[in-house]
Amino acid sequence: MKITLVSSCGLVLEQDGSALLIDALNKQFRCYYGLPPEVFAKMLAGEPPYDAVCGVLFTHAHPDHYSASRTEQLRAACGAPVFLPQPNTPERLMMQLGPFTVECSRFPHIPVPGMAEAPHAVYWISAAGKNIYVTADAQIDTERHRTILHGRRADAAFWNGQYLSHPETRELLLEAAVKNYIYHIPVDEKDVCGIRRKCERSMARFGAELPDVSLLEQYPSSLEA
Protein backbone atom coordinates (compact mmCIF):
# COMPACT_ATOMS: atom_id res chain seq x y z
CA MET A 1 0.00 0.00 0.00
CA LYS A 2 1.33 3.41 -0.95
CA ILE A 3 0.68 6.27 1.48
CA THR A 4 1.24 9.93 0.66
CA LEU A 5 1.03 12.82 3.11
CA VAL A 6 -0.33 15.68 0.99
CA SER A 7 -1.26 18.22 3.67
CA SER A 8 -1.07 18.70 7.44
CA CYS A 9 -2.95 15.49 8.27
CA GLY A 10 -4.01 14.71 4.72
CA LEU A 11 -3.29 11.12 3.72
CA VAL A 12 -3.84 9.44 0.36
CA LEU A 13 -3.84 5.62 0.50
CA GLU A 14 -3.42 3.76 -2.80
CA GLN A 15 -4.20 0.10 -3.35
CA ASP A 16 -5.14 -1.89 -6.46
CA GLY A 17 -5.70 1.24 -8.52
CA SER A 18 -8.01 2.90 -5.96
CA ALA A 19 -7.32 5.90 -3.74
CA LEU A 20 -8.75 6.64 -0.29
CA LEU A 21 -8.45 10.19 1.07
CA ILE A 22 -8.29 10.95 4.81
CA ASP A 23 -8.34 14.57 6.06
CA ALA A 24 -6.85 15.53 2.69
CA LEU A 25 -9.23 18.32 1.67
CA ASN A 26 -8.19 20.97 4.16
CA LYS A 27 -7.12 24.54 3.50
CA GLN A 28 -4.30 26.51 5.11
CA PHE A 29 -5.33 27.23 8.72
CA ARG A 30 -3.09 29.10 11.14
CA CYS A 31 0.30 27.36 11.04
CA TYR A 32 -1.01 24.11 9.52
CA TYR A 33 -0.18 23.19 5.93
CA GLY A 34 -3.15 23.20 3.58
CA LEU A 35 -3.66 21.02 0.54
CA PRO A 36 -1.94 22.94 -2.29
CA PRO A 37 -4.37 24.32 -4.91
CA GLU A 38 -2.48 22.54 -7.70
CA VAL A 39 -2.96 19.16 -5.98
CA PHE A 40 -6.64 19.89 -5.45
CA ALA A 41 -6.91 20.75 -9.15
CA LYS A 42 -5.47 17.32 -10.02
CA MET A 43 -8.07 15.71 -7.76
CA LEU A 44 -10.90 17.58 -9.48
CA ALA A 45 -9.53 16.66 -12.91
CA GLY A 46 -9.25 13.00 -11.96
CA GLU A 47 -5.55 12.83 -12.74
CA PRO A 48 -3.71 9.76 -11.35
CA PRO A 49 -3.77 8.70 -8.59
CA TYR A 50 -7.09 10.53 -8.23
CA ASP A 51 -8.75 8.86 -11.21
CA ALA A 52 -10.35 6.23 -8.96
CA VAL A 53 -11.13 7.83 -5.60
CA CYS A 54 -13.18 5.25 -3.71
CA GLY A 55 -13.83 7.27 -0.56
CA VAL A 56 -13.20 10.52 1.29
CA LEU A 57 -12.89 10.25 5.07
CA PHE A 58 -12.48 12.90 7.74
CA THR A 59 -11.58 12.49 11.39
CA HIS A 60 -13.41 15.70 12.35
CA ALA A 61 -14.54 19.04 10.98
CA HIS A 62 -11.86 21.43 12.25
CA PRO A 63 -10.51 23.55 9.37
CA ASP A 64 -6.98 22.13 9.52
CA HIS A 65 -8.54 18.76 8.59
CA TYR A 66 -11.67 19.61 6.58
CA SER A 67 -12.98 22.11 4.06
CA ALA A 68 -16.70 21.87 3.31
CA SER A 69 -16.35 23.70 -0.01
CA ARG A 70 -13.50 21.52 -1.27
CA THR A 71 -15.32 18.41 -0.15
CA GLU A 72 -18.47 19.33 -2.05
CA GLN A 73 -16.44 20.19 -5.15
CA LEU A 74 -14.68 16.83 -5.15
CA ARG A 75 -17.88 14.93 -4.40
CA ALA A 76 -19.51 16.61 -7.41
CA ALA A 77 -16.49 15.88 -9.60
CA CYS A 78 -15.94 12.20 -8.83
CA GLY A 79 -19.01 10.98 -6.94
CA ALA A 80 -16.95 9.31 -4.19
CA PRO A 81 -18.72 8.68 -0.87
CA VAL A 82 -17.81 11.09 1.93
CA PHE A 83 -17.81 10.32 5.65
CA LEU A 84 -17.50 12.92 8.42
CA PRO A 85 -18.24 11.93 12.05
CA GLN A 86 -21.48 13.37 13.41
CA PRO A 87 -22.86 13.62 16.97
CA ASN A 88 -25.01 10.53 16.30
CA THR A 89 -22.22 8.45 14.70
CA PRO A 90 -22.03 5.05 16.47
CA GLU A 91 -19.08 4.29 18.72
CA ARG A 92 -17.86 1.81 16.09
CA LEU A 93 -18.76 1.70 12.42
CA MET A 94 -17.53 -0.54 9.59
CA MET A 95 -17.30 0.55 5.94
CA GLN A 96 -16.07 -1.04 2.72
CA LEU A 97 -14.65 1.52 0.30
CA GLY A 98 -13.16 -0.12 -2.77
CA PRO A 99 -10.38 -2.44 -1.58
CA PHE A 100 -10.25 -0.73 1.83
CA THR A 101 -12.01 -2.11 4.91
CA VAL A 102 -12.49 0.81 7.28
CA GLU A 103 -13.18 0.56 11.00
CA CYS A 104 -14.22 3.93 12.42
CA SER A 105 -14.11 4.40 16.21
CA ARG A 106 -15.33 7.48 18.04
CA PHE A 107 -12.55 9.11 20.07
CA PRO A 108 -12.62 12.52 21.80
CA HIS A 109 -10.45 15.34 20.44
CA ILE A 110 -7.46 16.68 22.35
CA PRO A 111 -8.76 19.70 24.32
CA VAL A 112 -7.82 22.91 22.50
CA PRO A 113 -8.54 26.27 24.19
CA GLY A 114 -10.68 28.48 21.98
CA MET A 115 -11.53 25.70 19.52
CA ALA A 116 -15.10 24.41 19.38
CA GLU A 117 -15.57 20.73 20.14
CA ALA A 118 -16.26 18.50 17.15
CA PRO A 119 -17.15 14.81 16.86
CA HIS A 120 -13.83 13.03 16.29
CA ALA A 121 -12.90 9.52 15.16
CA VAL A 122 -9.86 7.34 14.56
CA TYR A 123 -9.57 4.81 11.73
CA TRP A 124 -8.20 1.27 11.39
CA ILE A 125 -7.89 0.69 7.65
CA SER A 126 -7.06 -2.66 6.04
CA ALA A 127 -6.27 -3.62 2.44
CA ALA A 128 -4.26 -6.42 0.84
CA GLY A 129 -3.03 -7.69 4.19
CA LYS A 130 -1.78 -4.28 5.38
CA ASN A 131 -3.23 -2.32 8.31
CA ILE A 132 -3.04 1.42 8.95
CA TYR A 133 -4.08 3.26 12.14
CA VAL A 134 -4.93 6.95 11.76
CA THR A 135 -5.44 8.93 14.98
CA ALA A 136 -5.42 12.63 13.93
CA ASP A 137 -6.14 14.73 17.06
CA ALA A 138 -7.20 11.92 19.41
CA GLN A 139 -6.92 12.93 23.05
CA ILE A 140 -4.26 11.34 25.25
CA ASP A 141 -5.97 8.12 26.33
CA THR A 142 -3.76 5.07 25.98
CA GLU A 143 -6.31 2.61 27.33
CA ARG A 144 -8.93 3.71 24.81
CA HIS A 145 -6.41 3.13 22.01
CA ARG A 146 -5.59 -0.31 23.41
CA THR A 147 -9.29 -1.17 23.52
CA ILE A 148 -9.65 -0.22 19.84
CA LEU A 149 -6.47 -2.02 18.82
CA HIS A 150 -7.50 -5.10 20.79
CA GLY A 151 -4.05 -6.66 20.53
CA ARG A 152 -3.65 -5.81 16.84
CA ARG A 153 -0.46 -4.16 15.57
CA ALA A 154 -0.65 -1.89 12.55
CA ASP A 155 1.92 -1.82 9.78
CA ALA A 156 1.87 1.99 10.03
CA ALA A 157 0.26 4.42 12.47
CA PHE A 158 -0.09 8.20 12.37
CA TRP A 159 -0.05 10.31 15.55
CA ASN A 160 -0.21 13.89 16.76
CA GLY A 161 3.08 15.21 18.12
CA GLN A 162 1.70 15.31 21.66
CA TYR A 163 2.08 11.52 21.74
CA LEU A 164 5.85 12.04 22.05
CA SER A 165 5.48 13.99 25.29
CA HIS A 166 4.37 11.32 27.77
CA PRO A 167 6.02 8.06 28.88
CA GLU A 168 2.74 6.17 28.58
CA THR A 169 2.10 7.36 25.02
CA ARG A 170 5.66 6.59 23.90
CA GLU A 171 5.13 3.07 25.25
CA LEU A 172 1.88 2.88 23.27
CA LEU A 173 3.67 3.76 20.03
CA LEU A 174 5.96 0.77 20.41
CA GLU A 175 2.97 -1.52 20.89
CA ALA A 176 0.66 -0.05 18.27
CA ALA A 177 2.57 -0.30 15.01
CA VAL A 178 5.63 -1.58 13.19
CA LYS A 179 6.24 1.97 11.93
CA ASN A 180 4.92 5.10 13.63
CA TYR A 181 4.75 8.52 12.03
CA ILE A 182 4.29 11.85 13.77
CA TYR A 183 2.35 14.13 11.45
CA HIS A 184 0.37 17.39 11.64
CA ILE A 185 3.72 19.25 11.80
CA PRO A 186 3.74 22.89 10.57
CA VAL A 187 6.26 23.89 7.93
CA ASP A 188 6.12 27.68 8.30
CA GLU A 189 9.69 28.98 8.28
CA LYS A 190 9.50 30.69 11.67
CA ASP A 191 7.51 27.85 13.33
CA VAL A 192 5.39 30.49 15.07
CA CYS A 193 3.37 27.93 17.03
CA GLY A 194 6.50 26.04 18.11
CA ILE A 195 5.06 22.61 17.32
CA ARG A 196 7.85 21.56 14.97
CA ARG A 197 10.56 22.55 17.45
CA LYS A 198 8.77 20.66 20.23
CA CYS A 199 8.54 17.51 18.09
CA GLU A 200 12.21 17.76 17.11
CA ARG A 201 13.26 18.26 20.74
CA SER A 202 11.20 15.25 21.80
CA MET A 203 12.83 13.07 19.14
CA ALA A 204 16.28 14.30 20.12
CA ARG A 205 15.53 13.41 23.73
CA PHE A 206 13.60 10.16 23.32
CA GLY A 207 14.56 8.95 19.84
CA ALA A 208 16.81 6.18 21.15
CA GLU A 209 13.80 4.51 22.77
CA LEU A 210 11.65 5.07 19.67
CA PRO A 211 13.58 3.42 16.82
CA ASP A 212 10.48 2.94 14.68
CA VAL A 213 9.12 6.49 15.04
CA SER A 214 9.68 9.17 12.38
CA LEU A 215 8.67 12.81 12.01
CA LEU A 216 6.90 13.71 8.77
CA GLU A 217 8.16 17.24 8.13
CA GLN A 218 8.03 17.34 4.32
CA TYR A 219 5.01 17.82 2.06
CA PRO A 220 4.45 15.66 0.16
CA SER A 221 5.93 12.60 1.87
CA SER A 222 5.55 9.16 0.29
CA LEU A 223 5.65 5.92 2.29
CA GLU A 224 5.05 2.22 1.77
CA ALA A 225 3.23 -0.03 4.23
Question: Language-model segments: which ranges?
Answer:
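Zn-dependent metallo-beta-lactamase
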Residues: 1-30, 34-42, 197-201, 205-225
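Active-site-proximal beta-strand elements of phosphoester/diester hydrolases
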Residues: 2-5, 20-23, 101-109, 131-137, ...
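Binuclear metal-ion centers of metallo-dependent hydrolases, dominated by the metallo-beta-lactamase
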Residues: 89-99, 117, 148, 170-225
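Active-site-proximal loop/helix segments of hydrolase catalytic cores
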Residues: 111-176
